[in-house]
Amino acid sequence: MVYCTASLPLLLLLLVGLLAGEAFAEQCGRQAGGALCPGGLCCSQFGWCGSTSDYCGPTCQSQCGGVTPSPGGGVASLISQSVFNQMLKHRNDAACQAKGFYTYNAFIAAANSFNGFASVGDTATRKREIAAFLAQTSHETTGGWATAPDGPYAWGYCFLKEQGNPPDYCVPTAQWPCAPGKKYYGRGPIQISYNYNYGPAGRAIGYDLINNPDAVATDPVISFKTALWFWMTPQSPKPSCHNVITGRWTPSAADRAAGRLPGYGVITNIINGGIECGKGFNDKVADRIGFYKRYCDLLGVSYGSNLDCYNQRSFGVSTNPLAASS
């Protein structure tokens, strides 16, 4: 005889959904287009919001830190404005496209709206997450070069949007149809691209980015929120960057076979592994590590292990030799 192992609260929730029919759809996660739960609640594997272990446990999809506030007053208690300015020392340089846009207050407001960000684990873990987030996004927006004043890792957040004449980055989908005349090229700290990312990001933060993608380059809080949405949200088969840096991700046997072990390097793999990882040493990965080490030093925390992805297969490359022909 086979017994159902689902917990009673989730069974009751599913039963209510069945009785309510179309009026009671899943609330979050992949079942709801990547939506986040209100009030920082955890999103269960089934797409429901809650704060108990049924929702926030190992199978949780997003905001898995629960609703317990971090000790000491949130993100601002972990990184001061002076340290933030020292990290992003040249972001307001006259030569930087984003001059005056990326402010400390905008970062703090956006960060505090994502429950779980920099609030999981001890103080060192929380600071390390801030360092990792700002490092990865600094690489995406860097204006530095090898001989730049104060070094190449003092020039993060110099750029705001993709340069040149970028395409519209529109991949028509039923769920996220592109708006007429709108382009979904890279904008903001993570350089969010494509309608299928703008759509769920906007839904998660409560703003229509399909019809207003330029908001990512005109409203600094929205801009930071899109990057934090990407950071906090797993996109199968990839874990979230948040879960990796806070130690909540446990690699599978396939991950281990692919060289994907817990550490900063897996975050690089999540963000751009198909281009940068599994190819030996390359300057882009080294640049991401350089930012990270500098920021960890400024925050007074250790780096952890497995910083690079030089020998990691990307999440899009199978370890199964038959996969390519299947």
From Swiss-Prot:
Intrachain disulfide bonds: C28-C43, C37-C49, C42-C56, C60-C64, C96-C158, C170-C178, C277-C309
InterPro entries with a match to the protein in the record: Chitin-bd_1, Chitin-binding_1_CS, Endochitinase-like_sf, Glyco_hydro_19, Glyco_hydro_19_cat, Lysozyme-like_dom_sf
Tissues expressing the protein: Expressed in the pulp of the fruit (at protein level). Expressed in mesocarp (at protein level).
Record lineage: Eukaryota, Viridiplantae, Streptophyta, Embryophyta, Tracheophyta
Protein's UniProt name: Endochitinase
Gene name of this polypeptide: chi1
Signal peptide feature range: 1-25
UniProt entry keywords in alphabetical sequence: Allergen, Antimicrobial, Carbohydrate metabolism, Chitin degradation, Chitin-binding, Disulfide bond, Glycosidase, Hydrolase, Pathogenesis-related protein, Plant defense, Polysaccharide degradation, Signal
Catalysed reactions listed for this entry: Random endo-hydrolysis of N-acetyl-beta-D-glucosaminide (1->4)-beta-linkages in chitin and chitodextrins
